[in-house]
């Protein structure tokens, strides 16, 4: 028997306004919720029970997971108070009969990891804990790892001058008995250092695939567009989508179910979700349009993220903005770079100042 704990209870304040109306784990990544990549990987492994640690908008996560038909035993655990990322491990271990080896993974990271190979590696090294590591371009944003062979020696959180580009990928395997020793809120700041001080063997599993911690909007944009290039270099159009013969499509692109693209419009390096309507003569470039978006004629969306059920009028230009769910933008409106518009707002006048927040 193998148990897994998926941590998906965070507030995701740095991803607002996107996370104000949906939990970070359910933000769409190339047409499906972020958490699904982890859940399907777990479902294809030897894991038999998946524990979901939830807090913020837990009902939305549960409703979604029920529709997945994972054919695994799913147990939801609702955090009644803030427990950090370490607290749920101790709580779940005290309440349920976990397996000897427990996989722990954050629900807000992207990684197509083979959990069976991770378990095999963990068991082969004979350590009580295994941490998954990945290499990144900017390690100063993460927990940087100092290793000796396959063993973890030290973890340094967000150093100004990183000693390496090897960082904590947020996927672990712990021996069940270790979870009783948790007395802090953070795995990387409290629990792992305590294990290392007590000379507990922590092995490091090298992960070489595509990985991203979806912490801020630019991370969210980046993982979507990188995955788009990787999965659909020639583009993808759903069979139920209707794209005008006079529209121009420049790969890579993704056009979801029941979406229409009008004549004279162009889609370039962008992800268009489900039930969207792109008017005539409009352009979408390096952007993400979630679901049920209405884009009027002769408008331009560039380097932006547009939430669900957003309605944009004609002759609009949105340049490098993040727009929350349910926003209404009138005709002939310009939205400048780094603008953030909170959900359900109505915008009738242009936003010329960069970095403005529409509350």
Swiss-Prot record:
**InterPro entries of this UniProt entry?**
Mannose-1P_guanyltransferase, NTP_transferase_dom, Nucleotide-diphossugar_trans
Superkingdom of this protein's organism: Archaea
A Pfam entry, by short name: NTP_transferase
State its Enzyme Commission number(s).
Answer: 2.7.7.13
Q: Which GO terms describe its biological process?
A: biosynthetic process
One annotated GO molecular function? mannose-1-phosphate guanylyltransferase (GTP) activity
Annotated signal sequence range: none
**Top EC class of this enzyme:** transferase
Task: Answer yes or no on keyword Repeat.
Answer: no
Catalytic activity, as annotated = alpha-D-mannose 1-phosphate + GTP + H(+) = GDP-alpha-D-mannose + diphosphate
SUPFAM superfamilies tied to this protein: Nucleotide-diphospho-sugar transferases
Q: Which PANTHER family match?
A: SUGAR-1-PHOSPHATE GUANYL TRANSFERASE
Query: Which family is it part of?
Result: Belongs to the transferase hexapeptide repeat family.
Recorded protein name is Putative mannose-1-phosphate guanyltransferase
What species does this protein belong to? Answer: Sulfolobus acidocaldarius (strain ATCC 33909 / DSM 639 / JCM 8929 / NBRC 15157 / NCIMB 11770)
């Amino acid at each position: 028997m193998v148990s897994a704990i998926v941590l998906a209870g965070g507030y995701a304040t740095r991803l607002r306004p996107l996370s104000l109306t949906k939990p970070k784990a359910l933000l769409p990544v190339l047409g499906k919720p972020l958490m699904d990549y982890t859940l399907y990987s777990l479902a294809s492994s030897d894991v038999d029970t998946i524990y979901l640690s939830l807090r913020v908008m837990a009902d939305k996560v549960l409703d979604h997971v029920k529709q997945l038909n994972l054919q695994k035993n799913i147990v939801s655990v609702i955090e009644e108070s803030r427990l950090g990322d370490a607290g749920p491990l101790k709580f779940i271990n005290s309440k349920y009969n976990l397996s000897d080896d427990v996989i722990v993974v954050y629900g807000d990271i992207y990684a197509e990891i083979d959990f069976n190979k991770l378990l095999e590696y963990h068991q082969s090294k004979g350590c009580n804990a295994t941490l998954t590591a990945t290499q990144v371009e900017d390690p100063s944003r993460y927990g940087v790892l100092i290793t000796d062979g396959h063993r973890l020696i030290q973890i340094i959180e967000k150093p100004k001058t990183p000693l390496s580009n090897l960082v904590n990928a947020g996927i672990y395997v712990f021996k069940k008995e270790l979870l009783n020793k948790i007395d802090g809120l953070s795995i990387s700041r409290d629990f792992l250092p305590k294990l290392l001080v007590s000379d507990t063997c922590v092995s490091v599993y090298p992960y070489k695939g595509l990985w991203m911690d979806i912490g801020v909007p630019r991370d969210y944009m980046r993982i979507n567009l990188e995955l788009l290039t990787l999965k659909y270099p020639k583009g993808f159009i759903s069979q139920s989508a209707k794209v005008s013969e006079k529209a121009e499509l420049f790969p890579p692109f993704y056009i979801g179910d029941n979406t229409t693209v009008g004549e004279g419009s162009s889609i370039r390096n962008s992800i268009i979700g489900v039930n969207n309507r792109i008017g005539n003569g409009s352009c979408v470039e390096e952007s993400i349009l979630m679901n049920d978006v209405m884009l009027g004629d002769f408008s331009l969306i560039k380097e932006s993220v547009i939430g669900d059920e957003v309605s944009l009028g004609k002759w609009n230009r949105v340049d490098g903005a993040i727009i929350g769910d349910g926003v209404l933008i009138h005709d002939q409106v310009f939205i400048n770079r780094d603008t953030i518009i909170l959900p359900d707002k109505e915008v009738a006048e242009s936003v010329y100042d960069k970095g403005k927040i529409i509350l």
